[in-house]
């Protein structure tokens, strides 16, 4: 593993990913450590255009189109991220595990299709650490209620998010490598040192 790792933050809506990645970014900045922070979907200019299309409240893509849009965003991002790979710490808000959790466990897309395209896009780009944020159903609902703007992914029924969160937890059990489940307290303690 490099001293300039790729660190991914995963989890369902309202689980604290954005808070955690922002805390780590502030910590790295305080320590004068070079880093780049991106989100998926989104990140580079073309990926942000795709993000708007995916998250538009009125968008109603079928599950395969939805998958391909997410992977198109990833492909665009990786063109940019490869310039910094092993040169800067790379922080990513959602990545390949989100694709599997949402598209496969949430929407039922064939896992073989997801893995095939993901592997084709990723090639030699490897994640060093994945931090999985989990949240209870009640806390997720409360957190989504206070959001100022909601996208179409914030408006699914709670049982959808529970399926997705179970998907993340299944991935963590299967992979057993580099996925760490975090609480807000742990990450804030780490970054406040």
Regions found by a protein language model. Give the residues of each.
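NTP-dependent small-molecule kinase module
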Residues: 2, 25, 138-193
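Hydrophobic positions on the alpha1 helix immediately C-terminal to the Walker A/P-loop
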Residues: 20
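Conserved lysine of the Walker
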Residues: 17
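Extreme N-terminal, non-catalytic leader segments
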Residues: 1-6, 33
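ATP-dependent small-molecule kinase phosphotransfer cores
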Residues: 33-122
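Walker A (P-loop) phosphate-binding loop of P-loop NTPases
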Residues: 14
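Hydrophobic anchor at the beta1->P-loop junction of P-loop NTPases
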Residues: 9
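A glycine- and Lys/Arg-enriched "phosphate-lid" helix/loop adjacent to the NTP-binding pocket
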Residues: 99-166
């Amino acid at each position: 593993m490099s001293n300039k790792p790729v660190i991914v933050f995963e989890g369902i809506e309202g689980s604290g990913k954005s808070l955690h990645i922002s805390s780590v970014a502030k910590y790295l900045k305080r320590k004068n450590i070079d880093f780049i922070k991106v989100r998926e979907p989104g990140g580079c200019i073309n990926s942000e255009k795709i993000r708007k299309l995916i998250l538009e409240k009125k968008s109603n893509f079928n599950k395969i189109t939805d998958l391909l849009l997410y992977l198109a965003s990833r492909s665009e991002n990786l063109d940019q991220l490869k310039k910094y790979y092993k040169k800067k710490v790379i922080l990513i808000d959602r990545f390949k595990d989100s694709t599997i959790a949402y598209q496969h466990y949430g929407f039922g897309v064939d896992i073989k299709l997801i893995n095939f395209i993901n592997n084709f896009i990723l090639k030699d780009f490897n994640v060093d650490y994945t931090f999985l944020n989990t949240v209870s159903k009640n806390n997720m609902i409360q957190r989504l209620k206070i959001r100022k703007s909601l996208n179409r992914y914030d408006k699914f029924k709670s049982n959808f998010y529970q399926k997705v969160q179970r998907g993340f937890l299944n991935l963590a059990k299967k992979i057993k490598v580099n996925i760490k489940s975090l609480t807000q307290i742990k990450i804030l303690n780490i970054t406040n040192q």
